[in-house]
Regions:
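Nucleotide/pyrophosphate-binding catalytic subdomain
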Residues: 4, 8-177
Length: 177
């Protein structure tokens, strides 16, 4: 087991979970469209305004996990059409950001989303080159769905006046597989 106090000293030293904290989970259909995202942010805003303590976990946008699986599979099969799926998913996230975020927030979010998608594209290209998608590689590919939706929705929450921050779970959770 890694010592997270040493690896993430600020986080480990400053983070404690209040006993009255709620953990809310929203699945893919709940975050499937900009309209649904707006609706769930309104729900979260009411919790926030009531002084509720909560953490939120978001799934990938509806259909994105399946698209990511298909991208990885196509890349491993040497099928360059993985790039078409990649571009569709990338554009869907950028369009959602443009629809959900006002100019200042959009300008902050777009570079992060683009960076995430460039990393995904490089990963898929590596899979394409070696014609192999290991379980670990596919786990990494799939992580982009939740990471991108969570990042984007955190920005929408901030824009709505909720004191929210995106937390990349890879920095605080260690798995054994």
């Amino acid at each position: 087991m890694q010592n997270y106090d040493r690896q993430f000293p600020t986080f480990a030293a400053s983070f404690s979970i209040p006993s009255n904290m709620k953990v809310l989970k929203f699945g893919g259909s709940s975050v499937g469209t900009p309209e649904r995202i707006r609706g769930l942010v309104e729900i979260l805003k009411s919790y926030y305004q009531q002084g509720e303590k909560f953490a939120v976990v978001f799934s990938a946008f509806s259909g994105v996990t399946d698209a990511l699986i298909a991208m990885g599979t196509k890349a491993a099969d040497g099928d360059a059409s993985y790039l078409d799926l990649y571009e569709t998913v990338r554009q869907r996230h950028l369009d959602a950001a443009a629809e959900l975020l006002r100019e200042g927030y959009l300008q902050q979010a777009q570079p992060e989303l683009e960076t995430n998608f460039e990393v995904l594209k490089s990963l898929l290209y590596g899979i394409f080159l070696v014609r192999e998608a290991s379980p670990r590689s596919m786990d990494y590919v799939l992580s982009f769905g939740e990471r991108n939706s969570s990042f984007l929705i955190a920005q929408v929450m901030r824009q709505a006046g909720i004191n929210a921050a995106y937390l990349d779970a890879r920095k605080v959770i260690k798995t054994d597989n």
